[in-house]
Amino acid sequence: MKVQLDNIDIIICEMIGRMRNIVNRNFKVKDNKVGMDTSVNIDVQGFLAEYAFAKHFNTFPDFDLRPRSGSYDAFYKGYRYDIKSTRRKNGRLITTTKINPDVDIYILAIVDDTEVDFIGYAFKDELIRAENIIDLGYGDTYVLERNKLHNFKNGHKKEIV
């Protein structure tokens, strides 16, 4: 499922992502990034994915700038989504070992300039399992390979996306 973003979308996402980063760093919210990119770039990339999800499903993105740790990125069809983004074309679904009680479903999004490709999703209990813990060089993280994700095109027995 690919979502194309136009120049105005990109500008909005850049602004919100950068502002969220400033607020979170000023309020000492712990940065749980997994990777070598800067926290600013990761926050912008993350909001690009959140915004693209909202645009595709015709929901309103969360423009909130209050400091936060945890929570969810989108609410749709009764489920709370955490959208995990990467710029790696072969990216996997990755989250920290800090369990977020506010999330039902995790989504993998590949961000490539003006396009966001939603690869698939996993229910929380499919991702948060001991056998999915791997140290990728930044400490233990939950990792789910792409072939274990539910495909957006094929759907799921529960209509969630």
Feature-to-residue mapping (PLM):
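Nucleic-acid endonuclease domains
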Residues: M1-K77, K84-V161
